[in-house]
Amino acid sequence: MISVNDFRTGLTITVDNDLWQVIEFQHVKPGKGAAFVRSKLRNLRTGAIQEKTFRAGEKVEKAHIENRRMQYLYASGEAHVFMDNGTYEQIELSEAQIERELKFLKENMEVSIMTYQGEVLGVELPNTVELKVVETEPGIKGDTASNVTKPATLETGLVVQVPIFINEGEMLVINTAEGKYVSRA
């Protein structure tokens, strides 16, 4: 059990027999009445986001999530195959389970698979990934007013806004949390 006063971003808890990850939280001490913790939680099974308020000092069950380092091997129809590098055990995840992460996954990429009591919850990506530009408009010389961007399609199908000087074939560093361009690789 953990007190809601000890909440931190990324903490995984069990509330109403469901797994939730704390996205945001705020301790509120009103001038009148008891203190409370206002939180925004993401359901790890469905992806739904819910705002929930807890009384200060209230206890919730902490969920012990296991993270396994795995390698993304390939897509086979609707299934995506991952392999544990230590045991060579392979697991398949459906497109629905990793819909958001698919935009960043490349073959042979190392990721962390989150599991809870043997149930696969999802894929945790690295903070940044390197992806190749497969399609973008050529930059026009002299068209540099200020922070000019253009759309670029990357090798995974993800479309991001990039500076005008980026060309096809270049490797870019992309932030996986926001899906935005960071720099050239």
From Swiss-Prot:
Pathway: Protein biosynthesis; polypeptide chain elongation. Pfam families: EFP, EFP_N, Elong-fact-P_C. One of its GO terms (cellular component) is cytoplasm. It is found in: Cytoplasm. The keyword NAD does not apply. Signal peptide: none annotated. InterPro entries: Elong-fact-P_C, NA-bd_OB-fold, Rib_uL2_dom2, Transl_elong_fac_P/YeiP, Transl_elong_KOW-like, Transl_elong_P/YeiP_cen, Transl_elong_P/YeiP_CS, Transl_elongation_fac_P. GO terms for biological process: peptide biosynthetic process. Keywords: Cytoplasm, Elongation factor, Protein biosynthesis. PROSITE patterns: EFP. GO terms for molecular function: translation elongation factor activity. Involved in peptide bond synthesis. Stimulates efficient translation and peptide-bond synthesis on native or reconstituted 70S ribosomes in vitro. Probably functions indirectly by altering the affinity of the ribosome for aminoacyl-tRNA, thus increasing their reactivity as acceptors for peptidyl transferase. PANTHER family: ELONGATION FACTOR P, ELONGATION FACTOR P (EF-P) FAMILY PROTEIN. Belongs to the elongation factor P family. This is Elongation factor P. The gene is efp.
